[in-house]
UniProtKB/Swiss-Prot annotation:
Stretch forming the signal peptide: none
Gene3D superfamilies to which the protein is assigned, alphabetical: 2.60.120.920
Pfam families in alphabetical order: CTLH, SPRY
Domain CTLH: 279-336
Domain LisH intervals: 241-273
UniProt-recorded name of the protein: Ran-binding protein 10
Polar residues composition-biased segments: 343-356, 371-396, 421-434
One GO term describing the cellular component: cytoplasm
Annotated B30.2/SPRY domain residues: 23-210
GO biological process, one term: cytoskeleton organization
Function in brief: May act as an adapter protein to couple membrane receptors to intracellular signaling pathways.
């Protein structure tokens, strides 16, 4: 980041650090659209951009005059560390007159980079100032214009720059004095100038609450911008706009698998859904498996329902396998959980018929047997007549046995019993809607001490707290008892074997496609979990956070959609992304209204 000035440096002083924290919070609240990595805010006066007669102290916030002060040639000014970012929309700072000195020849205002610092602000081109001795405003000229009252010791003078209409007004002791300057150029710096001995001023760039209620003024302009957006003329295109918006909402619901909601929305708006209901449910259930940490089952389901998808997406396959290894460490993947979890015979497994998907058969080209000497566990997705299936990436495997040995399995048969067609009309039956809640992720007690509550997922949504988090009441008691692979020796051996297969897959992909730094880091991070006695509390332990499943879940869902010639991202999200980029572009071209046109202000 660019120079922030002494006013932003942390020290060992707790009081100073508290003030710095307060400053950061206040600036974020006042200027939420500003990205300080790109355009830092002024936080102090610059020790490098001042005339020699200026002295700085108190973290470069206090300015005192140290020249002779005989005439105007002894004037001296200092600029802030950075110019005012356009993304502020409205920017404000205050200066307190600690001492008016001998004559009170002080100027407060703005100037561009390169303006002579041996002058008071306002006397030169691209320089603007309000002077205390006569109350005049100076706009790039040595001749001032009557503006406001004089100011002296104890007064607080504020300077507000409106980057929306490019004007500036001043305040005195919390009261606005009216507009002083118009048609201001961009990239102006807060500036203060002194001319006679004894003059001392303190700046407040947000270190303390302002005397003037700048937030109320900002609220007025925020309301103006929002009203302008709301009144944007649509005219005769209203019908077209409504149709576009309805399609965007519908595609968003379909993309994320909210099947019943999508069907209800289609009926209400008399629109069509561009994906058959069975396909939506298949994607929904695969996502649920990933979010529940049952990645092996999700891989098998994907291979059965969408043959060839992972074979043609080796990067995605590798990501999934690395995540499966992490879930093995966590004790949540079926490959290791079956060693320590006993459940009643499964009554719902994938059917062995090609009817499991309207578009795909039941073949499983990616599965590869682990061999007779290795323990095998069902992921609950292998058809009874297909225990083994090979793919070209022979270094990795998904062990399978009879579905009856599955610790938990998923019913796909009901949702596929309805013969759905593409572009379903809005008259879909209620029976199709209610099947959204068919799948349950059963209550299972893992031997690592983490209990997952029964999670019934309704209407395409999941109970985030239940799927992604352990029972709050048991976390404190069980964190210390969590063990690798649930503490089961056979499960640990299976995990190690899987790790070897994963290493083999990595080497095979490297030979076939060349080195991949992302794959290398992914594998190293996953394997690094084994270097710690408590993987959940180690430098790479964030991988075990259930929230980490969401990225791979999204990637898999997008790949499935893309394989069916559907958008891999919902148009609604693309539109939001484009709007966000446009607002950021407005900031780069110094359009101040971007500050009050942020996309998240319109999301409810």
């Amino acid at each position: 980041m660019a120079e922030l000035g002494a006013g932003s440096l942390l020290t060992g002083d707790p009081a100073f650090n508290y003030q710095e924290h307060e400053l950061n919070e206040r600036l974020k609240r006042l200027y939420p659209a500003v990205n300080e990595e790109e355009t830092p805010l002024p936080r102090s006066w610059s020790p490098k951009d001042k005339y020699s007669y200026i002295g700085l102290s108190q973290n470069n916030l206090r300015v005192h005059y140290k020249g002779h002060g005989k005439n105007h040639k002894d004037a001296a000014s200092v600029r802030a560390t950075h110019p005012i970012p356009a993304a502020c929309g409205i920017y404000y700072f205050e200066v307190k007159i600690v001492s008016k000195g001998r004559d009170g020849y002080m100027g407060i205002g703005l100037s561009a980079q390169g303006v002579n610092m041996n002058r008071l602000p306002g006397w030169d081109k691209h320089s603007y100032g309000y002077h205390g001795d006569d109350g005049h405003s100076f706009c790039s000229s040595g001749t001032g214009q009557p503006y406001g009252p004089t100011f002296t010791t104890g007064d607080v003078i504020g300077c507000c720059v409106n980057l929306i209409n490019n004007t500036c007004f001043y305040t005195k002791n919390g009261h606005s004095l009216g507009v002083a300057f118009t048609d201001l150029p961009p990239n102006l710096y807060p500036t203060v100038g002194l001319q006679t001995p004894g003059e001392i001023v303190d700046a407040n760039f947000g270190q303390q609450p302002f005397v003037f209620d700048i937030e109320d003024y900002m609220s007025e302009w925020r309301a103006k911008i929002h009203s302008m957006i709301a009144r944007f003329p649509i005219g005769e295109r209203l019908g077209d706009w409504q149709a576009v918006l309805q399609n965007m909402v519908s595609s968003y619901l379909v993309h994320h698998g909210y099947c019943a909601t999508a069907m209800a929305f289609a009926r209400a708006t008399e629109t069509m859904i561009q994906e058959d209901q069975t396909s939506i449910k298949n994607r929904q259930r695969i996502q649920k498996l990933v979010l529940a940490g049952r990645v092996g089952e999700a891989i098998d389901a994907t291979q059965q329902l969408y043959p060839g998808l992972l074979e043609h997406n080796p990067n995605l396959l590798f990501m999934l396998k690395c995540r499966q290894f992490v879930e093995m460490v966590n004790g949540t993947d079926s490959e290791v959980r079956c060693f320590s979890v006993r459940s009643p015979k499964s009554q719902d497994s994938y059917p062995g018929s090609p009817n499991m998907s309207p578009r795909h058969g039941a073949t499983n080209p990616h599965l590869h047997s682990t061999g007779a000497d290795s323990p095998t566990c069902s992921n609950g997705v292998t058809p009874p007549n297909k225990n083994k299936s090979h793919n070209k990436y022979t270094g990795i495997s998904s062990a399978s046995s009879s579905p009856s040995s599955s610790p938990s399995s998923v019913n796909y048969s009901e949702s596929n019993s309805t013969d759905s067609t593409k572009s379903q009309p809005h008259s879909a039956t209620s029976n199709q809607e209610t099947s959204d809640s068919e799948m349950e992720i059963e209550a299972e007690h893992y031997s690592n001490g983490v209990t997952e509550s029964s999670t019934r997922i309704m209407n395409g949504t999941y109970k985030h707290q239940e799927i992604l988090q352990a029972d709050d009441n048991s976390v404190d008691d069980t964190c210390s008892s969590r063990q690798l692979c649930g503490g089961n020796q056979a499960a640990t051996e299976r995990m190690i074997q899987f790790g070897r297969e994963l290493q083999t897959l990595s080497e095979q992909l490297c030979r076939q496609y060349g080195k991949n730094a992302t794959h290398k880091k992914m594998l190293q991070d996953a394997f690094s979990l084994l270097a710690y006695s408590d993987p959940w509390n180690c430098p790479v332990g964030q991988q075990l956070d259930p929230m980490q499943r969401e990225a791979i879940c999204s990637a898999l869902n997008s790949a499935i959609l893309e394989s069916q010639n559907l958008p891999k991202q919902p148009p609604l999200m693309l539109a939001l992304g484009q709007a966000t980029e446009c607002v950021q572009l407005m900031a780069r071209v110094r359009s101040g209204s971007c500050s009050f046109a942020r996309v998240d202000n319109f999301l409810h």
